[in-house]
Amino acid sequence: ETKVFSKWLLKPQEELFPGLYKKFYKRFDIKNEYFKTWFAERAIQEIFFYRERIKEYKNQDILKVILSRAARSARQIPHYDLARPAKPVKEKYYCIKHKRTCEPIEEALKFIDRYSWDTIKRIKEFDKIRTSATIKIIQGDSREVRLNKFSFDGIFTSPPYVGLIDYHDQHKYAYELFDFSNNDFKEIGPASKGRSQQAREEYQCDLIKVFQNVSNWLKPKAKIFIVVNDKDNLYPKIAEECNFSIEEIFHRPVLMRTERDNYQFSESIYYLKKK
């Protein structure tokens, strides 16, 4: 139905059975400054029309995921800068990702359609291999979260990199669209705090709190794998303060990044073990 609504947006009502369309459709009066800044008017209308229709369906969480993916892709930002755009793009620009002149994105419909079919495909593929195993997701501050009924053989994690990304801001479209609680003031190592000595020390202190907390539920000799960009060499002290031994450190270049720039980026994987 979003396709029909989109056609209604693009053509005068009298050309498309005016009685029918006037009865069922209306433009959304969106005053949200974030959407007005980062999205074209057509995209805004399509996104909020789809959101309005979600409540009529059973699998609402799946539809919200589809819409969230579509909203991320429909922002008026350069194709090569999906993670940290500085400002919206309102005119044609040279795209280093596609190596040609690209235009600002005007619609959300094509992304809604693309991700709908992609999601169906993924669900069908997963259904063929899924087992009776269960997964429990606990949302909380890892410095404080309590996991009293559990014990773990190990951890595999990739914490935020100090001063690199404002993760809440990167996904602001979802916070604004679904009215999620914003806990950006709790974010560890955000770009907004920079990479000063004070910021690095605060980051290190926060990560020590994280691993000391979760260590309470780790079995003896538990294995910990941490994917990091540790150019400041912060993790040896983190391991020491948490009573973890460093078993090995693996290094690798990162070749397929979200940002299509020329910045050389590498990561390390720390293999630690609880003493």
Q: Which residues are covered by each model-predicted region?
A:
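SAM-dependent nucleic-acid methyltransferase catalytic core
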Residues: 40-156, 162-165
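Acceptor-substrate binding/catalytic loop of class I
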Residues: 30-42, 197-203, 224-230
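A short glycine-rich, Lys/Arg-flanked "PGG" loop and its adjoining helix->strand segment in the class I
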Residues: 204-220, 239
